[in-house]
């Protein structure tokens, strides 16, 4: 099973390459309740990541690096209510 530090390293590796501004971990890994079947939930502020091709490239790069499924969301792609539900449990992976 992955550690938060492993996820942070993977996101940092690709963050600059894909031009993301900030990335946060949420869900089971952020809450410390992940198991072998858990995917990795990440929400990003896109920064320079503006095309679907770039988004897909980042997603596939993270999945390859981590060896597991990644649920990659963007801040502007989720409703404010959803963000309110996750903001207290999120962990900064990359950015400010």
PLM regions and their residue ranges:
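Short hydrophobic/aromatic beta-strand micro-patches
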Residues: 43-45
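Catalytic core of pol beta-like nucleotidyltransferases
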Residues: 1-22, 31-36, 47-96
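Conserved histidines in hydrophobic membrane contexts and catalytic metal-binding motifs
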Residues: 25
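Conserved H-loop
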Residues: 28
């Amino acid at each position: 099973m992955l550690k938060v530090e492993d996820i942070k390293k993977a996101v940092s590796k690709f963050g600059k390459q894909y031009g993301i501004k900030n990335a946060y971990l949420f869900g089971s890994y952020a809450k410390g309740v992940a198991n072998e079947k858990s995917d990795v939930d990440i929400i990003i502020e896109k920064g320079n990541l503006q095309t679907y091709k770039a988004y897909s490239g980042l997603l596939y790069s993270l999945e390859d690096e981590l060896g597991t499924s990644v649920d990659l969301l963007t801040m502007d792609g989720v409703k404010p209510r959803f963000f309110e539900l996750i903001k207290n449990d999120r962990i900064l992976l990359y950015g400010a």
